[in-house]
Curated annotation (Swiss-Prot):
Record PROSITE patterns: RNA_POL_BETA (PS01166)
Entry keyword Glycosyltransferase: no
Provenance organism: Streptococcus pyogenes serotype M12 (strain MGAS9429)
CDD domains assigned to the protein according to its UniProt record, in alphabetical order: RNA_pol_B_RPB2
Protein name: DNA-directed RNA polymerase subunit beta
EC number: 2.7.7.6
Family label: Belongs to the RNA polymerase beta chain family.
Length: 1197
């Protein structure tokens, strides 16, 4: 027997074909959401408050300080928030201290700071009753970047940019004359030496001393001449910079100093953030700059005089490690003191080394490092600027390397916690201005924190983010896999990110650093391709937001692959050589072969086993969760695998789903972490279990109660239904499944079914990927799903009086009211068709001046005779089904309703949709198609069913027939392998796991096929169900996992006769949602013209479009059975005339005798009375009344 048994949870065992021993379990798949939000609550929020506060008034006599904050209990539970359309949020109370610096008086007070949405355990937020997800954003990391560019003459130039998290950009660039310039915040360029002089190093010799001799430095110094002898060089430089930043304003050295301090050196205005400081220090650190260079001077320990490294030594990694302590200490540190006119006058510490130029061995190049400022310094320092300039100048000497902006070491993730912190900071910054003004205006003695704090800007910023940000998205709730994928999504779009139109090919492309961090397969097709990605299965964020991936460490001394796990970011990985997970190992953990396949800085090649530093932990660490659910992924073309991964997320939850016979072993973990199942929180024993709740007694005697969700409407209109798995007496452990969610079976993801599939053509019905299906799948509800739609009706106060929910609806017969209760609301369980009343509602009509008789009737019969209009909620087209639930909200019951709304009724209708022609089906390999024919299953007698589908030698009919031509050109051979292995698994009565890149080999496949007693080619003879004759050739028949997708024909079918028209053009609206018509465009008109179908064309352009009076007349004629009158003038013709007149063209309409005709006269029919809309409505009401009277008299009889 090939393979080995593996248990997945307590309910499923699979035969696995994996050969690689995995030393690391998958992390919790939604930790990117939950951990980030927890960090925000624990420390992120505190940091934001500490960034903005304390706030002082303009005279610095009062100061508002932050003490701490606390979250109280949420107002609603999760379920209540869903029902009441409320947000699941907790009130936050912040303690402030107001200090009067003149009197020393301190007032401490707790201030309510609004309701803050709280993340659920599933990683989602409930906002206004809807479940939402904050998508993590992939952005360019703050830091310093270097790039090269080639001009039109082929000359290579260099550029550099310091990008902060918040603040002005500082750029450097070279031109064709080898002069180096700087730009501050995208303004006009100035020689870079001007900025150096402004920093207090004004002498030419001083500049050469810092940066060393180079053509770029000399050329720039010559360009940067002393223009005004009355100013010092530093003052002149400061004025020149001020002129660039504030052109037209009077320039002084002092104003320039304060401007530059605000731009770069003030931590409140300029923030690199922790990640920016880490990146700047890493890039400008002397150790990375010296690596592999030949040192041009003896390195001497200043204290002992010992020569650490002799001149001419190559600075390999081992040499640098041997003197690391000295490099981190004071080795070659120089202190430069700026002159008194400088922007910042503190001494500047730099680390300087001389190395041999890689281009010209006779030249010496100076390398300047920033001497590692403290991590807490968030603003730029003069040392950072000088070290950046040195790196930039060294690039022309062949030292250092330019950055790849698409490298994942330069792109980071802003997860939900950071996005919320940024939003909160925006709100607090708006509040700060407000607070400062109030502190200055009001009397200091009576001021309290409560009085000066207005929380509205903060709550508005948070509300706006959750409600309308591009990154706050309505959760994709088609099935648990789509929920999970949505939580792990990484978007490069959104505020501070890219835009679709400006994103080029490079940004979207797969990069070698994506390996183990971002999935190379799962991304949308269309305009967002490559901009929206998914986290790989083992991907994890470090504290700076860079994605790490785990590797097994290789002990270089013994050559053994250890079980020690090291998490590496993309730029850390660049320093090492990593072997693949499938490298063969001996028993003792050493490599079995001397040459192994590995990667180093994007090169995939063979390496000697002795140079390997790390080994992948798992073959599936490359791909995302949805991709890891595709068996035989290694046999599929990547384009089709992309479709397969995306289509699994569109699977509709079925009534009785089945887990796949051929899985990958990922189904259990995906279902477990998706948040759609009920998972045990503690160990214990089941003491009560039914369909709605499970009670578990813990070992310490306390009782846990788990509520099971039944048929709740999901975000995508499917039934969200959980099924209990445990029974009384079962012992459960923490993490066990208590109930399956939608699209799950026995604790595994189950998106579809396992039908018997044959690759063959049948009467041409499976042309172009169409799917032929047996009626058995319809009758036995194999692909039946339940869909829930929500309809609501509200009563408001109108100018003419309040609307009312009632059973007394004008002009409606008793038949239409049979399922309404005494209030006029449909009963639960009623079967409704389109047009049926769900909620009876009347709205008062404008009452005309009443005659004396009417007033008398009014006085006698009261409200009976008043004018009301029927505005009942009716079932829309395609909305028929069974009423599942009714919810009523009124002010009297204490429900929160919108202003002006008195009562709100919600009706939920459930539809059971069987599969039908036009529905879309798919496998897991991107093999999708539309059901084109459902082959009937007749019955000759009670005993012998007749099946037109082809059948196997044992009489089993085939369930689905697919077109064999869909396989070769698409290159997704995985489907054929799945087909054969699925048949073998069914025959053996087992389930199989074939993990991606480590699954069943072709030998395993054929061994299993033989074990199952199938023919050696895994094909079979098929018999024609209509004639009983065998087909000429043997056919590939097997079991394939097929899913029904959310693109159902019921949602797309649409027809219109009478409907709404656009207000301006008077043409019918478009689209199913607006109950619109079909657009008959220019080309369609040409087609009718070509056939000479003038009458058809005329009615399309008039009655059916925008001939307003014509269509009313036509309607009347049809209802009265009269001949249809001639059409009038379309509204669009009048628009054309008016537009031409507005251009000053004299356009008139003339009759045969050249007499001018008024356009409105054209509509006046010869003798026809025009029926206006009001008349039409009256006629309809009269007709309805007559119908009702007739039905009432019939009832009496």
């Amino acid at each position: 027997m090939a393979g080995h048994e593996v248990r997945y949870g307590k309910h499923r065992t699979r035969r696995s074909f994996s050969r690689i021993k995995e030393v690391l379990d998958l992390p919790n798949l939604i930790e990117i959401q939950t951990d980030s939000f927890q960090d925000f609550l624990d420390s992120g929020l505190k940091e934001v408050f500490e960034d903005v506060l304390p706030i002082s008034n303009f005279t610095d006599t009062m100061e508002l300080e932050f003490v701490g904050y606390e979250f109280k209990e949420p107002k609603y539970t999760l379920e209540e928030a869903r029902i009441h359309d409320a947000s699941y949020s907790a009130p936050i109370f912040v303690t402030f201290r107001l200090v009067n610096k003149e009197t020393g008086e301190i007032k401490t007070q707790e201030v309510f700071f609004g309701d803050f949405p709280i993340m659920t355990e599933m990683g989602t937020f409930i906002i206004n009753g809807g479940e939402r997800i904050i998508v993590s954003q992939l952005v360019r990391s703050p830091g310093v970047y270097f790039n090269d560019k080639v001009d039109k003459n082929g000359k290579v130039g260099y550029g550099s940019t310091v990008i902060p998290n918040r603040g002005a950009w500082l750029e450097l660039e070279t031109d064709s004359k080898d002069i180096a310039y700087t730009r501050i915040d995208r303004t006009r360029k100035i020689p870079f030496t001007t900025l150096v002089r402004a920093l207090g190093f004004s002498g030419d010799d001083e500049i050469v001393d810092i940066f060393g001799e180079s053509d770029l430095v000399r050329n720039t110094i010559e360009k940067d001449i002393h223009k005004n002898p009355s100013d010092s060089r530093t003052d002149e430089a400061l004025k020149e910079i001020y002129e660039r930043l504030r052109p037209g304003e009077p320039k002084t050295a002092d104003s320039s100093r304060s401007l530059l301090i605000a731009r770069f050196f003030d931590a409140r205005r300029y923030d690199l953030a922790a990640v920016g400081r880490y990146k700047v220090n890493k890039k400008l650190n002397i150790k990375t700059r010296l690596l592999n260079q030949i040192i041009a001077e003896n390195l001497v320990d200043a204290e002992t005089g010992e020569i650490l490294v002799e001149a001419g030594t190559e600075m390999t990694r081992s040499v640098i490690e041997s003197i690391e302590e000295h490099l981190d200490g004071d080795l070659n540190k120089f202190v430069y003191t700026p002159n008194d006119y400088a922007v910042v006058t503190e001494p500047v510490v730099l680390q300087k080394f001389k190395v041999v130029s890689p281009i010209d061995p006779d030249r010496v190049v100076t390398i300047v490092g920033n001497a590692n400022p403290d991590d807490k310094v968030r603003a730029l320092t003069p040392a950072d600027i000088l070290a950046e300039m040195s790196y930039f100048l060294n690039l022309a000497e062949g030292l250092g390397k330019v950055d790849d902006i698409d490298h994942l070491g330069n792109r980071r993730i802003r997860a939900v916690g950071e996005l919320l912190a940024n939003q909160f900071r925006i709100g607090l910054a708006r509040m700060e201005r407000n607070v400062r003004e109030r502190m200055s205006v009001q009397d200091n003695d009576v001021l309290t924190p409560q009085q000066i704090i207005n929380i509205r800007p903060v709550t508005a910023a948070v509300k706006e983010f959750f409600g309308s940000s591009q990154l706050s998205q309505f959760m994709d709730q088609h099935n648990p896999l789509s929920e999970l994928s949505h939580k792990r999504r990484l978007s490069a779009l959104g505020p501070g990110g890219l835009t679709r139109d400006r994103a080029g090919y490079e940004v979207r492309d797969v990069h070698y650093t994506h390996y183990g961090r971002m999935c190379p397969i799962e991304t949308p097709e269309g305009p967002n391709i490559g901009l929206i990605n998914n986290l790989s299965s083992f991907g994890h964020l470090n504290k700076y937001g860079f994605i790490q991936t785990p590797y097994r460490k290789v002990d270089r001394a013994t050559g053994r692959v250890t079980n020690e796990i090291v998490w590496l970011t993309a730029d850390e990985e660049d320093e090492y050589t990593v072997a693949q997970a499938n490298s063969k190992l001996n028993e003792d953990g050493t490599f079995a072969e001397e040459i192994v396949m590995g990667r180093h800085q994007g090169n995939n090649q063979e390496f000697s086993a002795s140079v390997v530093d790390f080994v992948d932990v798992s073959p599936k660490q490359v791909v995302a969760v949805a991709t890891a659910c595709i068996p035989f992924l290694e046999n599929d073309d990547s384009n089709r695998a992309l479709m397969g991964a995306n289509m699994q997320r569109q699977a509709v939850p079925l009534i009785d789903p089945k887990a796949p016979y051929v899985g990958t072993g990922m189904e259990y973990q995906a279902a477990h972490d998706s948040g759609a199942a009920v998972i045990a929180q503690h160990n214990g024993k089941v003491v009560f279990s039914d369909a709605e709740k499970v009670e578990i007694r813990r070992q310490d005697g306390s009782l846990d109660v788990y509520h099971i969700t039944k048929f709740r409407r999901s975000n995508s209109g499917t039934a969200y239904n959980q099924r209990t798995l445990v029974k009384v007496g079962d012992i459960v452990e923490k993490g066990d499944f208590i109930a399956d969610g939608p699209s799950m079976e026995n604790g595994e993801m189950a998106l579809g079914q396992n039908p018997v599939v044959a690759y063959m053509t049948w009467e041409g019905y499976n042309f172009e990927d169409a799917v032929i299906m047996s009626e058995r799948l319809v009758k036995e509800d194999v692909y039946t799903s339940v869909h829930l739609e929500e309809f609501e009706s509200e009563t408001r106060d109108t100018k003419l009086g309040p609307e009312e929910i009632t059973r007394e609806i004008p002009n409606v017969g008793e038949e239409a009211l049979k399922d309404l209760d005494e209030m006029g609301i449909i009963r639960i369980g009623a079967e409704v068709k389109e047009g049926d009343i769900l909620v009876g509602k009347v709205t008062p009509k404008g009452e005309k001046d009443l005659s004396a008789e009417e007033r008398l009737l009014h006085a006698i019969f009261g409200d009976k005779s008043r004018e009301v209009r029927d505005t009942s909620l009716r079932v829309p087209h395609g909305g028929d089904g069974i009423v599942r639930d009714v919810k009523i909200f009124t002010r009297a019951n204490g429900d929160e309703l919108q202003s002006g709304v008195n009562m709100l009724v919600r009706v939920y209708i459930a539809q059971k949709r069987k599969i039908k022609v036009g529905d879309k089906m798919a496998g897991r390999h991107g093999n999708k198609g539309v059901v084109s024919r459902i082959v009937p299953k007749g019955v000759v007698s009670r005993i012998v069913p007749v099946e037109d589908m082809p059948y196997l030698p044992d009489g089993t009919p085939v369930d689905i027939m697919l077109n064999p031509l869909g396989v070769p050109s698409r290159m997704n051979i995985g489907q054929v392998m799945e087909l054969h292995l699925g048949m073998a698994a069914r025959n053996l009565g087992i389930h199989i796991a074939t993990p991606v890149f480590d699954g069943a080999s072709s030998e395993d496949l054929w061994d299993t096929v033989r074990e199952a007693g199938m023919d050696s080619d895994a094909k079979t003879v098929l018999y024609d169900g209509r004639t009983g004759e065998p087909f000429d050739n043997r056919v590939s028949v097997g079991v394939m996992y097929m899913i029904k997708l959310h693109h159902m024909v019921d949602d797309k079918l649409h027809a219109r006769s009478v409907g709404p028209y656009s207000l301006v053009t008077q043409q019918p609206l478009g689209g199913k949602a607006q109950f619109g018509g079909q657009r008959f465009g220019e080309m369609e008109v040409w087609a009718l013209e070509a056939y000479g179908a003038s009458n058809v064309l005329q009615e399309i352009l008039t009655y059916k479009s925008d001939d307003v009076t014509g269509r009313l007349k036509a309607y009347e004629a049809i209802t009265k059975g009269k001949p249809i009158p001639k059409p009038g003038v379309p509204e669009s013709f009048r628009v054309l005339v008016k537009e031409l007149q507005s251009l000053g063209l004299d356009m008139r309409v003339l009759d045969e005798d050249d007499n001018e005709v008024e356009l409105r006269d054209l509509d006046e029919g010869e003798d026809d009375d025009i029926m206006h809309v009001d008349d039409l409505e009256k006629a309809r009401e009269k007709q309805a009344q007559e119908t009702q009277e007739v039905s009432e008299t019939t009832d009496e009889k």
